[in-house]
Amino acid sequence: MKKLTALLLALAMVFALAACGGGNASTPAASNGGSGAPAASAAASGDKSAAAPTGGDSAESPVAGKKVAYIMLMSSATIFQMWSDSFQATAEKLGMKADTFFCSDNADQWKTQVQTCADGGYDGLMVSHGGQEYAWDFLKGILEQHPDLKIATFDTPFKDANGQVQKIDGVTQFFQQDAGFARSLVEELLKLNKDKVDAGEAVRILQVQQGAGYNSPFDRRQVGYQEYLDAGKIVNVERIAPTDDQNATSSMRDVTAATLQKYNDTADIDGIWCCYDAYAQGVYQALKEANSEIPMVSVDICNEDIQFMAEGKNWKACATTNWTSNGEFACRVLALEMAGQYDAIEASSCYDKEIGAWMEIPSTIVTQEQVMSKSGVTVENLQDVADASYTDTSWMPTCDWMVELLGH
């Protein structure tokens, strides 16, 4: 009887241990606002979570089993979802678990989500579009609370209360090649006005751009544009911008329509340069309504832009980056930080000016001719018509184990 009792107790302990081993750890609670655990927050907002894979090559990765998050200030959009999907797919190949959180253009929600993930035990955070007026001080505080956490940032300038540019040790910053966007688009307008350029005349441009200090990407785009102004290759007919930022596209349509009435179309304006595609959409609508023949170009791209270019009218080109590549790049940088391989990040070919400053994702031009070369072109299949620079990944940071796990 005693032997039977002992046997039954032993079996009970085995089943109890098996049950414990198969359970899941409780998820961390949000730091404030009652938004729940990071995973719950993602599910509630329609965001996606990629579970870490088991087996396979993940055991060879020094970041296998790590938990990372992509936290975007803005609401979800096609290009940001492309980024998220690529970030998560790359994380999975490296053996990590990745979550995505979109923050509805709300800075307080963005900061709360960063704090929640940091408090919740995430190993790495890829944070995007934080405001220059708060990002440096806020993220510095997060790392003081969680010194083992790794952070990489996209389109998130660091400035102190005096407006001075700052750095945070161990945090890799990267941006799009904004000045490059501007340069390549001006070059497109120069090509469209070759006779004038050959004659040594300045090309007359209606510039769609906000004033200095509006935001960091626009300021960096102005740097590239200004080079052509200073060289006398272009001259501004006028600079215009929307008067209502909350309804930027419709406001830009109205502003452009009023501006066009002051000029004699192509006799006075050789081209329109737009710093942002949401503005460009309004410009294009105004040009169509006025039956204008003035060509235009714009930074950024979305499916609506592609549809407008495919109409074969005024919209001649967009400057963009490959958002699928952007997501992979972001995950690579964060993984290398977590692996302590900052030397591999520094070996990348896309640092701006000096190692340790910030990295810039290379830009590419998508032309009207490319978009019209086949039917059904979207941002999701843009690689089918864009030139080789769109799919080039030679500029990405890598190392031996990444080459093995990611293929390059």
What does each model-found stretch correspond to?
Residues 1-67, 92, 119, 141-148, ...:
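Short, low-complexity disordered leader/linker segments with a strong preference
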Residues 50-60, 64-66, 202-212, 329-408:
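Hinge/cleft segment of the Venus flytrap/periplasmic-binding protein
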Residues 55, 62, 110, 172-203, ...:
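Hydrophobic alpha-helical segments within soluble ligand-binding/sensing domains
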Residues 55-86, 90, 99-112, 122, ...:
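Extracytoplasmic "Venus flytrap"
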Residues 79-96, 181-185, 216-236, 251, ...:
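Short, solvent-exposed amphipathic alpha-helices that sit
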Residues 92-104, 204-207, 229-249:
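Short beta-strand elements in bilobed, periplasmic/extracellular small-molecule ligand-binding domains
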Residues 119, 124-146, 224, 241-308, ...:
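Hydrophobic alpha-helical
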Residues 140-180, 200, 204, 303-311, ...:
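Flexible loop/hinge segments that line or gate small-molecule binding clefts
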